[in-house]
């Protein structure tokens, strides 16, 4: 079902299974918890077991970006069939490229943790609480998260974007791990990394380049596993 989140992000046939379960198997809502609408200090909370549209669509851009919460309201999954990069000449954004003029309050953000977008403004994601988690500042600005955003932006977009966010327990605000899959020019990869300063990690991110049949989800009879290699995080300039 829509709330049966896998342990890591998926690609290929497994992505299609997740997309259909999330988009076709549940009611998608438009809950806007952007800072410009609720205030940057309003301690709004996410609804549990909810699928929310988080793509910027005010200028009729057909973005289909969806966030999924679990039964305690943690943001655990984000999925998009196509990432449509922001066009600041045609879309309504601030002079900093934001769709919302203020960021919302994010529990546990601050003290070394940014209010980190799962899908950045530059990639068409809103500053919605359903698109934000407390992310270690260096990771968000210079680590794998920044690298992914920069790579997709320079490529002019991506397909089959899937993020899975892991927490130490069902009540925690701060994630322990992100796993993000996406395809550029037909080549898929999954980057899985801890929510910590990349300079403090020893092995770097785990990166896979899977094929279509690398994951097992309900309804699939697949047993292959992807080849995994350890690579040091690459750096990029922040948004």
Regions found by a protein language model. Give the residues of each.
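Compositionally biased, low-complexity segments of secreted and virulence-associated proteins
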Residues: 1-42
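N-terminal leader or domain-start segments enriched in small/polar residues
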Residues: 45-46
């Amino acid at each position: 079902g829509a709330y049966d989140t896998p342990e890591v992000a998926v690609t290929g046939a497994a992505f299609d299974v997740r997309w259909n379960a999330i988009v076709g198997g549940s009611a998608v809502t438009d809950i806007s918890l952007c800072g410009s609408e609720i205030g940057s200090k309003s301690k709004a909370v996410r609804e549990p077991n909810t699928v929310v549209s988080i793509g910027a669509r005010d200028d009729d851009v057909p973005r289909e970006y969806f966030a999924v919460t679990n039964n305690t309201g943690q943001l655990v999954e984000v999925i998009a069939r196509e990432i449509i990069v922001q066009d600041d000449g045609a879309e309504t954004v601030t002079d900093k490229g934001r769709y919302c003029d203020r960021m919302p309050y994010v529990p546990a953000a601050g003290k070394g943790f940014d209010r980190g977008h799962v899908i950045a403004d530059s990639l068409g994601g809103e500053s919605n609480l359903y698109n934000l988690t407390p992310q270690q500042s260096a990771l968000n600005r210079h680590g794998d998260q920044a690298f992914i955003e920069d790579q997709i932006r320079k490529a002019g977009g991506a397909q089959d974007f899937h993020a899975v966010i892991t927490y130490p327990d069902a009540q925690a605000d701060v994630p322990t791990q992100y796993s993000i899959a996406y395809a550029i020019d037909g080549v898929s990869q999954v980057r899985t990394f801890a929510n910590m300063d990349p300079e403090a990690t020893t092995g770097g991110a785990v990166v896979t380049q899977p094929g279509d049949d690398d994951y097992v989800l309900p309804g699939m009879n697949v047993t292959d596993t992807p080849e995994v290699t350890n690579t040091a995080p690459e750096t990029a300039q922040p948004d």
